[in-house]
């Protein structure tokens, strides 16, 4: 759509996955330092007030990652990876006009880096986030390690998709320059403990995966941006889903969420483990809502990789 980007979208690179193509950014150095914009039109889900929130989240992450120093002799080959991201949706985004991502380098330390990113349209902030990057392997031997076990239903569903035994649903069918299909597919596996009389005990389970494989050139940063994009797919409908009502009629679009979960008015994400392989772009997820009321809902989401390891 004309006007959806500031610059003409580049040709599609066949060596990259559809997800990488969708999430491409362009640097706007002529406007100012650390300013980026979407290279392609972003998806507006049918019936939604604004564009897909996962696109804004993932492009903010990608923009911040562009300002993280690469390993070099000057920093002792340090690798910094995202470990915390606190987000707020301020206004509904418009897919028909470009987004400018303004990154501020708040702090560069030896073990942690801090960035803030504002996504702006027509001079107004539509989304803001604070991100913290942690130096890889900065913990000593005294650190402890634990995580939630992947639910059996999610594990079985993920095993089937890895073997190609289950078809998924197109989640993003928007005009993204990558055929008419979206960059990932997903499927709801069911609701664990759906027999419970208490909605807060019912837990929807799903799996998602990228179409194709993330390219070697995309690396860890592309995997993390892809995870951010996909993790928003089933999240917002959790409250209405556990109540067995239509999301469209539930009026629950202003959901707020605590740390290690996702989406809408406020959200926070703690990334525990990074994605390192093409297979890592296939993940299982489980959502749970401990409370809803006054037109709002509290939702928690957990994500596991194909090996059942907690990602966040």
Q: What are these language model-derived features?
A:
Residues 2-312:
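Terminal targeting signals and extreme-terminal segments of soluble enzymes
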């Amino acid at each position: 759509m004309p006007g959806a980007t500031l610059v003409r979208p580049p040709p599609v690179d066949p060596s990259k996955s559809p997800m990488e193509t969708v999430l491409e950014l362009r640097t706007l150095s002529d406007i100012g330092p650390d300013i980026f914009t979407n290279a392609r039109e972003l998806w507006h889900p049918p019936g939604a007030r604004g564009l897909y929130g996962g696109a804004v989240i993932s492009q903010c992450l990608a923009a911040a990652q562009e300002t993280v120093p690469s390993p070099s002799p000057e920093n002792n080959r340090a690798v910094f990876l995202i470990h915390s991201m606190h987000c707020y949706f301020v206004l509904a985004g418009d897919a028909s006009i470009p987004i400018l991502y303004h990154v501020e380098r708040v702090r560069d330390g030896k073990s942690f880096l801090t960035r803030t990113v504002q996504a702006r349209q027509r001079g107004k902030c539509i989304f803001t986030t604070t991100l913290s990057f942690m130096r890889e392997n900065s913990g000593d031997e005294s650190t402890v390690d634990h995580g939630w076990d992947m639910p059996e239903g999610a594990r079985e569903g993920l095993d089937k998709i890895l073997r190609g035994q289950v078809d998924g649903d197109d989640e993003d069918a928007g005009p993204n320059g990558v055929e008419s299909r979206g960059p990932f597919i997903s499927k709801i596996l069911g609701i664990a403990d759906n027999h419970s009389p208490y909605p807060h005990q019912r837990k929807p389970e799903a799996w998602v995966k990228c179409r194709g494989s993330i390219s070697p050139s995309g690396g860890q940063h592309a995997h993390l941006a892809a995870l951010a994009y996909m993790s928003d797919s089933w999240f917002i409908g959790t409250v209405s889903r556990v109540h067995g009502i239509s999301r469209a009629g539930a009026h629950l679009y202003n959901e707020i969420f605590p740390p290690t979960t996702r989406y809408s008015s406020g959200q926070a994400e703690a990334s525990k483990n990074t994605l390192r392989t093409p297979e890592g772009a296939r993940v299982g997820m489980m959502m749970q809502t401990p409370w809803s009321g006054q037109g709002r809902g509290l939702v928690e989401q957990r994500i596991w990789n194909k090996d059942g390891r907690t990602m966040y």
